[in-house]
């Protein structure tokens, strides 16, 4: 079993700082919002994206899957009362020449073995798709 620890502290009424290991992330905890930091909802979505990308990094060697890059786009919908995320849609965009069957296999592995995405999927509607950035027939 793995364990994780993060500490966050208020800097001032405009922001907070989260730390773990030797890393820091500025948090938007300003009631008016701020453009130079992730607010809690954006940080939540970024955590899902990081989980998916890390999952891809984990399974590509096992699948002998070749790629040049990955981008994950997420869109969350929040209800007001009580405030919570009710659905999250994602697109995983892979720069690869692998065929559709292999791309689907990558997607299945990412969804099956993602700690954060599995946790979220138990609580919120999490749906999405995987696609490639290049058409294999024209990218050679």
Predicted regions and their residues:
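Extended beta-strand/beta-hairpin segments
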Residues: 1-46, 56-140
């Amino acid at each position: 079993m793995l364990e994780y620890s993060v500490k966050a502290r208020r800097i001032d009424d405009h922001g907070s700082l989260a730390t773990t290991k030797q890393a820091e992330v500025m948090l938007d905890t300003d009631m008016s919002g701020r453009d130079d930091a992730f607010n809690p909802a954006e940080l939540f979505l970024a955590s899902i994206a990081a989980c998916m990308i890390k999952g891809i990094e984990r399974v590509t060697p096992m699948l002998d899957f070749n790629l040049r890059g990955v981008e994950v786009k997420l869109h969350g919908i929040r209800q007001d009362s009580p405030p919570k995320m009710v659905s999250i849609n994602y697109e995983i965009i892979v720069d690869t020449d692998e065929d559709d069957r292999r791309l689907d296999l990558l997607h299945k592995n990412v969804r099956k073995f993602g700690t954060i995405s599995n946790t979220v999927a138990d609580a919120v509607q999490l749906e999405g798709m995987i696609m490639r950035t290049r058409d294999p027939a024209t990218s050679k």
